[in-house]
Amino acid sequence: MNQEWAALGDLRQRVLDAAHAALELEVAALGLLSQRLSAQVEGAFPVLYACRGRVVVTGIGKSGHVGRKISATLSSTGTPSFFIHSVEALHGDSGALTAGDVLIAISNSGTTAEVCAFGELAARMGVPVIAVVGQIDSPLARLATAVLDVSVAREAEPLNLAPTASTTVTMVMGDVLAAALMAARNFTAADFALRHPGGALGVRTSVLATGGPSGAHHSISSESQ
């Protein structure tokens, strides 16, 4: 251990206490999600499974960052998806939304004006809306076809302000839905390899799908996983 760090005494202990408390709060938030998971999946999964277009994900701020990751995971695991920033959606980008699509709208408060407005627009177009919210009685939840409750007892940082535990639960919910869709569609390693030929994962999936690495995979950058 660095001697200067060890000599900090009280500051060192406060840092470690905050770190452990944050982790415990994140784990507790996932425990709450686990308790209500079956009902959540049974509500949203049929909407996603019936989608014949693309799964469009939207959000703003930290919810938007998480939404981008959810969309990327869906696309790489057999569910075509893309992300639209809610503000851009209200300035023309909603034109990318078509009949047959599903909109996943993420807002922890469920009151973010632009996200709600995009949700309302999608609903008027006949596009099913899945609301991912921390408040199930919010405006966004009320307009939705299905609601995913990602509420947490508190955020993981000391002030209980910065999106931390709530964004973790939201991202995990996206992973859960992607995994459920993979299982329903019998998505295979070969399917994954087709969508992800690059990086270490490309090499790994080539081995799983064909029994041996493909030379084409080695010619693509291995920086990404």
Each predicted region: which residue ranges?
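Glycine-rich phosphate-binding loops that contact phosphosugars or nucleotide phosphates
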Residues: Y49, G53-M182
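Aromatic-residue hotspot detector
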Residues: V41-F45, F83, F192
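An N-terminal, well-structured beta->alpha segment
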Residues: E4-A50
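Internal, active-site/partner-interface "lid" segment
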Residues: R142, A156, A183-I220
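Alpha-helix boundary/capping and short turn/kink residues
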Residues: Q35-S38, I60, N186
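Generic N-terminal leader/processing signal
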Residues: E24, I60, H218-S221
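Short, low-complexity, intrinsically disordered N-terminal peptides in bacterial proteins
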Residues: M1-D17, A209-Q225
